[in-house]
Amino acid sequence: MLISNEWLKEYVTIDDSVSNLAERITRTGIEVDDLIDYTKDIKNLVVGFVKSKEKHPDADKLNVCQVDIGEDEPVQIVCGAPNVDAGQYVIVAKVGGRLPGGIKIKRAKLRGERSEGMICSLQEIGISSNYIPKSFESGIFVFSESQVPGTDALQALYLDDQVMEFDLTPNRADALSMIGTAYEVAALYNTKMTKPETTSNELELSANDELTVTIENEDKVPYYSARVVHDVTIEPSPIWMQVRLIKAGIRPINNVVDISNYVLLEYGQPLHMFDQDAIGSQQIVVRQANEGEKMTTLDDTERELLTSDIVITNGQTPIALAGVMGGDFSEVKEHTSNIVIEGAIFDPVSIRHTSRRLNLRSESSSRFEKGIATEFVDEAVDRACYLLQTYANGKVLKDRVSSGELGAFITPIDITADKINRTIGFDLSQNDIVTIFNQLGFDTEINDDVITVQVPSRRKDITIKEDLIEEVARIYGYDDIPSTLPVFEKVTSGQLTDRQYKTRMVKEVLEGAGLDQAITYSLVSKEDATAFAMQQRQTIDLLMPMSEAHASLRQSLLPHLIEAASYNVARKNKDVKLFEIGNVFFANGEGELPDQVEYLSGILTGDYVVNQWQGKKETVDFYLAKGVVDRVSEKLNLEFSYRRADIDGLHPGRTAEILLENKVIGFIGELHPTLAADNDLKRTYVFELNFDALMAVSVGYINYQPIPRFPGMSRDIALEVDQNIPAADLLSTIHAHGGNILKDTLVFDVYQGEHLEKGKKSIAIRLNYLDTEETLTDERVSKVQAEIEAALIEQGAVIR
């Protein structure tokens, strides 16, 4: 939105520079993106009067003009503009003057004739050709009214001005108008805002005698009104109005069209003006378009309509596409005499869909899309009637023809001074707060401690108490909020919560094991939403996802970790070890919030040991991944157990569930070869744990023991067993018969292949013995070892 300071002064008067005003507006929530100064780079620009014009003796397209610029004698200026003529008031850049683009005006001779200055077009003084009236597109600008030669041309053109460009957020649609901005400025400077004149001298003839209005779709069009103006004269609008439109980025057309656009900018209320005699009937019917119905819009384009489009009709034929663009046969033309002015409220969603589908974005549609102020609908139409009467010689018929209900002009919200002060740390009295609301143009009522604020419809961004609190903070001034320290009744030393402490421990363990922490998106594709999910629950899908890859909330962290590993491997980083602690989401019943559960997941692929100085290269395998998980359990003083499992997406023979206190809390396994190949990964191992479940278990105390005074002893045992017997079953048997001197076991080799029967595998296990009270003897260890071997043989193992 472009806000002219010269125009703004018509509604509110302040004693401050435009730069200070722009800074103040920005600091209170509306960003002023740019400040356009029309006086910049311009010097010695005056009004001139062309006293005479003669053809240049040596150039067919040049004219020698004698121009009065308010000095003792006229100056001679050679001009090539086709529309220059004697008797015109024009813009003159004097010798020594300067124009935009660094152009300096000097005395010169053009084809032998002296030229002392330059008669200027609007383009030459910095106006974009996009906004210049068509009558001056290819020539100099000519004032339509008498001027005083020698006066400042920028002042005569209302261009002695600076324009603020607002970068508005969607919630501040009120600032899409001059009056809305004036309310804001008046509040900032605690001054009054003056509204423009809207009262016309009306004829005794009633508009109801010439027109009827019917709404067939009040769910989409809650209100539609029209007023009638007769005997308008189509001519250029006054210069001040044209220039204000130009500064706002709109090309002037004629007085009737310009008044429509002017009121749009003034009130933020889009209007449409129909040629009453071209409508074709005395009725206006608002309805939904019929399927396949066609109409030609003002841009001479035939549009095929959908039933979702709203149309204004003469009872049969569409004469306008509501809120977007008018129809061609009812538009205002040079011979138009009688005008019907439309003011309405249209459904924002319908207007947005229509304008986007037809690629017809306009000043009107953008305002309807954001919602308009009900308080300004009729007032804007009345303002247009007044301007047509004043600047188009129109005769305004009395009464308004309307259908539907405008709705409330205000929304009451109750609040207290205590609530405001407690929220933002102020110490304002009730009177101070009421004054701020009154500055904003909000009426108030006081009942004891309660302030009832009447929020006008133009401020659609204010719907709850917190919005009112923000308004108080804005107008009072964020910079004026006092700096205070919080007061505590009791001061305690800060510390981590139990969950924070345990989370930090887990991260340290995983980082110490060589894994890097990853943070991935919570959104995945619909296909990946249930991949690796430990619970089969309904997914949570976005209504309008930005892409198919981010359409649903995840139920596992692994899809994005696999994607991250694949991304790294594709970029020559083939040894990837990642973990993530993050939330997954499970849907509940309709209308209920989803369950949000924190998971711990990891992925390992490539070599675990990669540098020679670290030792022999070690490729990631199941047992290494399990060792990482076991480190987590040891750090948390928990005991995990493992059980063979089949999980979609994982290798059927190298996957296990992870149990804690006989409850499944996760899984570990090798990525299925097909899935790994699809992601250009070699053997890859993953794990996932319900982190919330880990955190819920009481860790208890870790009991430390002195370093043993007596040496321990190790024995290795190699077993040949059926390939479907898990190592965990063998270890369970070993510990059951190891007595109190068997301290721990370690599987250090697994072999299948040559020299073994089909369906068999060899497992090598190290048994570590220790007695803390005395030195172990071979006889004692051998006895326990024999008992263990006997139990294993009974289980079906063959001692190798």
UniProtKB/Swiss-Prot annotation:
GO BP, sorted A to Z: phenylalanyl-tRNA aminoacylation
Upper taxonomic lineage: Bacteria, Bacillati, Bacillota, Bacilli, Bacillales
Binding site for Mg(2+): D461, D467, E470, E471
Alphabetical list of InterPro entries matching this protein: aa-tRNA-synth_II/BPL/LPL, B3/B4_tRNA-bd, DNA-bd_dom_put_sf, Fdx_antiC-bd, Fdx_antiC-bd_sf, NA-bd_OB-fold, Phe-tRNA-ligase_IIc_bsu, Phe-tRNA-ligase_IIc_bsu_bact
EC numbers for this chain: 6.1.1.20
Keyword flag Cell membrane: no
Record's protein name: Phenylalanine--tRNA ligase beta subunit
Subcellular location: Cytoplasm
Similarity comment: family membership: Belongs to the phenylalanyl-tRNA synthetase beta subunit family. Type 1 subfamily.
Co-factor(s): Mg(2+)
Domain tRNA-binding: start-end pairs: 39-154
Keyword entries, A-Z: Aminoacyl-tRNA synthetase, ATP-binding, Cytoplasm, Ligase, Magnesium, Metal-binding, Nucleotide-binding, Protein biosynthesis, RNA-binding, tRNA-binding
HAMAP family from the UniProt entry: Phe_tRNA_synth_beta1
Gene3D superfamilies (UniProt xref): 3.30.56.10, Bira Bifunctional Protein, Domain 2, Ferrodoxin-fold anticodon-binding domain, Nucleic acid-binding proteins, Phenylalanyl-trna Synthetase, Chain B, domain 3
Reactions this protein catalyses: tRNA(Phe) + L-phenylalanine + ATP = L-phenylalanyl-tRNA(Phe) + AMP + diphosphate + H(+)
Positions of the FDX-ACB domain: 708-800
Domain B5: 408-483
Domain of life: Bacteria
GO cellular component: phenylalanine-tRNA ligase complex
Cofactor info, note text: Binds 2 magnesium ions per tetramer.
Broad class of where this protein is predominantly found: cytoplasm
SUPFAM superfamilies in alphabetical order: Anticodon-binding domain of PheRS, Class II aaRS and biotin synthetases, Nucleic acid-binding proteins, PheT/TilS domain, Putative DNA-binding domain
Pfam families on file: B3_4, B5, FDX-ACB, tRNA_bind, tRNA_synthFbeta
Enzyme class: ligase
